[in-house]
């Protein structure tokens, strides 16, 4: 189990996809996309409050995309034009011969080994943010000229970090500088693939970098930094008994009744993480060149520049 802290470096926007109304302090009303799923939390004798959350599924999807890019993994896409260009990287279809990313995060007929719980932020972390208007991604006849070269995909697209641009599109966001804690359960997988997971989180103690989550990435939103504070390895028999009883890997996240075989924090945790990443590199699960390229694309010093303003 990995205990981590996530800190927003720019405003974070994860929408429900429906329009909501936001009222300013002056009484003006704006149509805005709700930024976060809001969860009712019972605080004992007080009235339940609604707290903004980052769904674990959103973080898991973002991390999977990076894990696929820095490992010898398939590209599970639906667009037939993309599939025709993938060659050996086409979607896995045999559960006995899955790529590292599919083993980690799951595939059709295979549950995977990673479960990430929802991350709750504080009620006061919500803000209203105005960013440039974004058009839908280009999927027209120019697709091949932008993304393919000599009948093969040029690579994967990742957005660099930028300071947010200003515009007329009102969004509800989690403010920059907000922090929250979360847990990741990794059960039954290979150690080298755990090293791949840590690298994809941007949590390599020697090469940390922020990742991007949610909407508004082109205009500077969604930059977050993840730091793994504590590593807990649970006794196998204890976890096996729990899973037999509940049938839910995610339930391990909130259980306090499992025995720990290893519980380290601080520099001890950092050293343990280094060992997993080194194992991933030695076994070829973590590819050095793509990993270096991803770190350069997502370098934190990109935040010193501002994203372009105006319609995208």
Which residues fall in each region the model found?
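RNA-binding basic/glycine-rich loop and surface signature characteristic of RAMP-family CRISPR effectors
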Residues: 1-312
């Amino acid at each position: 189990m990995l205990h981590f802290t996530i800190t927003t470096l720019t405003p974070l926007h994860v929408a429900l996809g429906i329009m909501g109304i936001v009222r300013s302090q002056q009484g003006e009303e704006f149509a805005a996309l709700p930024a976060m799923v809001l969860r009712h939390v019972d605080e004992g004798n007080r009235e339940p409050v609604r707290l903004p959350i980052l769904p674990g599924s959103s973080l898991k999807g973002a991390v999977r995309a990076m894990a696929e890019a820095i490992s010898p993994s398939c590209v599970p896409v639906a667009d037939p034009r993309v599939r025709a260009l993938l060659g050996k990287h086409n979607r896995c279809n045999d559960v006995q011969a899955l790529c590292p990313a599919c083993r980690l995060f799951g595939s059709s007929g295979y549950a995977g080994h990673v479960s990430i719980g929802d991350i709750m932020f504080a009620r006061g972390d919500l803000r209203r943010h105005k960013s440039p208007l974004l058009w839908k991604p280009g999927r027209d006849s120019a697709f091949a000229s932008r993304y393919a070269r000599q009948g093969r995909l040029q690579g994967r697209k990742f957005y660099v970090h930028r300071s947010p641009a200003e515009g007329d599109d009102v969004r509800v966001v989690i403010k920059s500088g907000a922090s929250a804690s979360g847990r990741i359960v990794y059960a039954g997988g290979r150690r080298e693939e755990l090293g791949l997971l840590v690298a994809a989180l941007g949590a390599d103690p020697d090469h940390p970098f922020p990742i991007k989550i949610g909407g508004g990435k082109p205009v500077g939103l969604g930059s977050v930094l993840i730091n793994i504070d504590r590593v807990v390895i649970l006794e196998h028999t204890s976890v096996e008994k729990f899973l037999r009883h509940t049938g839910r890997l995610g339930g391990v996240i909130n259980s306090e009744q499992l025995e720990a075989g290893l519980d380290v924090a601080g520099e001890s945790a950092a050293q343990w993480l280094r060992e997993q990443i080194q194992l991933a590199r030695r076994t070829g699960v973590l590819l050095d060149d793509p990993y270096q390229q991803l770190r350069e694309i997502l370098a934190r010093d990109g935040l010193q520049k501002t994203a372009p303003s105006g319609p995208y």
